[in-house]
Amino acid sequence: MTTHASSYQLFPLGDSAITVDYGNRIDEALNREVLARYLQFRHQQFPGFIEAVPAYSSLTIYYDPVFIRKLQPEGQTAFEYIRTRITEMLSLAIPVEEKPSRLVRIPVCYDPSLSTDIENLAALKQLSTDELILLHTERIYRVYMMGFLPGFAYMGTVDERISAPRKIKPQPTRAGSVGIAGQQTGIYPLASPGGWQIIGMTPVQLFNRNRKDPTLLQAGDRVQFYSIDKYEFAHY
């Protein structure tokens, strides 16, 4: 399948980047287009291009402003010059991947001793912990974007019955902690202050700088969680 660009806006991000903004929403079809455009810019780099960074519904293009100043016509800013190049590229039809992406199954121990918020969240949602676990594991989630920490995958969308607001005050969070924030779910790859509601922990290492591919997950992947007990967690 090929597509032309959906409606978007362009705005500068400092003096060395432009963001292509498709709107503030979580939409799988739109995210597929964002990733397709990401590949387009990576494979068809314009002079001065540095990198492209995809998000849920936007794509940020970084460029070398010093190099661009050598190319831009007199009376035109670097932003105006790059905006023209980006608009030209976005006018081109591009292929959008339709076949299912890679499926990664990740074990999670939901035992309350490893999940600081599961009991409170279950009570808040008027569910048993078993019901909450079932609702979290029965879906296949899409990795919409990477960010926050190396290897941190923003996944969605969770069942509305277990969606939860972020904590008002961030708390120390262990590496491997599985959390929910809004309709997103994610795994902390490193120990960090965090505001997500922690409902479990995985023994899987999400980030390892010594691996060929340091991050286990990539944008566009699909993820399914499955429940394990404390013994399986300890001996994984």
Please tell me what each predicted stretch does.
Residues 2-236:
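Glycine-rich active-site loops that engage anionic ligands at enzyme catalytic sites
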